[in-house]
UniProtKB/Swiss-Prot annotation:
Organism: Acinetobacter baumannii (strain SDF)
Annotated protein name in UniProt: Ribosomal RNA small subunit methyltransferase J
EC number: 2.1.1.242
Gene3D superfamilies in UniProt: Vaccinia Virus protein VP39
Pfam families named among the record's database cross-references: SAM_MT
GO molecular function, one term: rRNA (guanine-N2-)-methyltransferase activity
Record's subcellular location: Cytoplasm
Length: 279
């Protein structure tokens, strides 16, 4: 069951988006149009003859498209979706012992965990597979709808469907959601933060150049511009510490501490690290 806290789109500007689709997928396109409209997005339906690579190259503006694999975000000749099914090989290799994130979040204890920076949901997918009960919070209506579509597809997959009931999608602003938990005197075991735009290191060198970011993230950055409505996640740290026994922050290995707050403990990997803050 998905939850709508009513604040998902409150701080976002009015959104308008095209949905491109071939005639065979008109019904699905109309469904997505209705869902997005209910979340404050104006959607223009654009039936086209052939949704292929050539069409995407000739229509580089940010848009949505629908095909036999569901809803996609497209721009600059590329298209992407969270695609949880593509994560299955990674999940099958994963274990509580092999995954650093499992040690950081104590997944062996099957925690109740709020992922306050949803992104594409891949880390939450892994954590749910390893036993956590996930509250996946996302405020952007288009990204939330993409996540919702990925979960719906996962529920029809023999492997993924085994643990989809451990993931609850929540359409809300993360700060508002954490404040609500605090006001209601509710606590969770873990709050997980993975800011999409990590702060730069002390030398002001970008952690990753845009050209090196994989396709999915390139398109996500177009949808959620760093200098627009999205932030670096620092303000979430204090809110998270009020409602969780343990706050885990994923960072590029050489990034500065989130909100310049030194963690109580760290787990270091080759490319990233996990900073822990305890209540």
């Amino acid at each position: 069951m998905e939850k709508n806290c009513g604040s998902g789109q409150s701080k976002l500007k009015a959104l308008r988006m095209h949905i491109y689709f071939e005639v065979d997928f008109q019904e699905q396109a109309q469904h997505y149009q209705a869902v997005l409209h209910s979340r404050g997005v104006t959607v223009d339906l654009q039936p086209i003859e052939k949704l292929n690579a050539r069409f995407l190259r000739l229509n580089p503006d940010l848009a949505l498209c629908v095909d036999e694999n569901g809803l996609w975000l497209s721009a600059n000749g590329m298209k992407m979706q969270p695609d949880w099914k593509a994560e299955i090989p990674r999940l099958k290799r994963a274990s509580l012992k092999s995954e650093m994130i499992a040690r950081a979040c104590q997944l062996g204890e099957k925690p109740v965990l709020v992922d306050a920076t949803a992104g594409l949901g891949h880390d939450s997918l892994l954590m749910a597979y390893l036993g956590a009960q996930i509250q996946l919070v996302e405020r952007h209506p288009i990204l939330f709808t993409l996540l919702e579509d990925s979960k719906a597809q996962a529920q029809r997959d023999p492997f993924l469907s085994q643990f989809m009931d451990r993931i609850q999608l929540i359409f809300a602003d993360s700060a508002s959601y954490l404040k609500q938990l605090d006001q209601e005197e509710k606590t969770v075991d873990v709050v997980y933060l993975d800011p999409m735009f990590p702060q730069r290191d002390q030398n002001q060198q970008a952690i990753k150049k845009q050209a090196q970011v994989k396709k999915q993230m390139q398109l996500l950055h177009l949808l959620l511009p760093e200098d627009g409505e999205m932030d670096l996640g620092g303000h979430l740290l204090e809110l998270a510490k009020k409602v969780a026994k343990r706050v885990i922050v994923k960072r590029p290995r050489h990034a500065i501490f989130l909100a310049n707050q030194e963690p109580a403990h760290q787990w270091q990997g080759d490319a990233c690290r996990f900073d822990a803050y305890f209540q």
